[in-house]
């Protein structure tokens, strides 16, 4: 099945609803993907890219239903990766002499994958053109390391369509092809996820390359990507976002992620987040347990954040393996303009937090002081965690924060509280958190002045998330 893109340009690609892993298992494609191939029929017939190798036979069969394969005059390969050029072997078996236009680096990559040096390769460079008839040309622009050395884009004059390769794409599968037809929230979430996890290491190249392309002074009516939607409605909006994301992007956001063996490091993470929120309630704080969270969502949040707090238990004197792996990925992504702090719990010996701090610094983060706790944090240790969060909130603030002062209740209010018999304070037997009836627990809609007997049965301890049955009367108040 083909879809009309514009005039004599048709999409002849392949949707992949089921794919959930990309680049091995390193990128989770939770919304599937598509492999976009385009057929141009002017006086010359041109095929731009193919599809993933697992769809090779299906792709060639579908293409044959659109055009006699022998009538294809040129094949353009913007990128040699297997999800772009994977069907070349199947296709070239039918039309072995058809010229393949690509960069010099692409020849090496294509031969490395397909092992056919006898194919009719034509090397192109930035500014080279190919006449396709009817007064139209293809103009080639090399884009090395966006995101492979062989990458290039192809611009079609007349119709003003930029075939942008991986740039401006997203792993997003939908029955509809164009950006104005799909769910906008989903689309832009996947665009940012794609940039954060794939293109971030090359951000320093994005702005000059976009500037170079704009320097050709060519109109762009559509951007036809290699994955996801074709941008036809205000196509330059995604270009503007790329320029923004490439400029050491950050939001007023802090990401906390951790791994834990006995919930101790999780308790620290929660307390740190509480401290941040006390001082700066406007900053967005997201907490992830790496053992239970989508790794690419965590990395996307790190990309969006001004800073990250990373927590780990100590195991065999080193950090937890999932934390080590994720920090290694952050090193490769080369995030810029971000701060970091390490924290974690240990038992008879430590080592993980110091090792983690060193790794984060090596990854390019500006480091703040780390925080350690021995065994399960008690009330004093949890208060130190909250104070650490307060300190971090002030150190990482994008603008000066107002000083907070402890509000003193009016005398008559104090008298009323003392006079009222609210019952004893209750202490969680697992994490030692204390419920004070005078303060309640506003985050769970338990108002100040609520005795324990009136607290709803679905109440959960804010520190360890266990229910009311693990609470006992505070020892100092037990009679």
Swiss-Prot record:
Residues 30-210 are annotated as: Zinc metallo-hydrolase. Its main location: cytoplasm. Fe cation 2 binds at residues 83, 166, 227. Fe cation 3 binds at residues 428, 431, 461, 464. Fe cation 1 binds at residues 79, 81, 147, 166. SUPFAM superfamilies: Flavoproteins, Metallo-hydrolase/oxidoreductase, Rubredoxin-like. Residues 423-474 form the Rubredoxin-like domain. One of its GO terms (molecular function) is iron ion binding. One of its GO terms (cellular component) is cytoplasm. Pfam families: Flavodoxin_1, ODP, Rubredoxin. Transmembrane segments: none annotated. Pathway: Nitrogen metabolism; nitric oxide reduction. FMN binds at residues 260-264, 342-369. Keywords: Cytoplasm, Electron transport, Flavoprotein, FMN, Iron, Metal-binding, Oxidoreductase, Transport. Binds 3 Fe cations per monomer. Anaerobic nitric oxide reductase; uses NADH to detoxify nitric oxide (NO), protecting several 4Fe-4S NO-sensitive enzymes. Has at least 2 reductase partners, only one of which (NorW, flavorubredoxin reductase) has been identified. NO probably binds to the di-iron center; electrons enter from the NorW at rubredoxin and are transferred sequentially to the FMN center and the di-iron center. Also able to function as an aerobic oxygen reductase. In the N-terminal section; belongs to the zinc metallo-hydrolase group 3 family. Homotetramer. HAMAP family: NorV. This is Anaerobic nitric oxide reductase flavorubredoxin. The gene is norV.
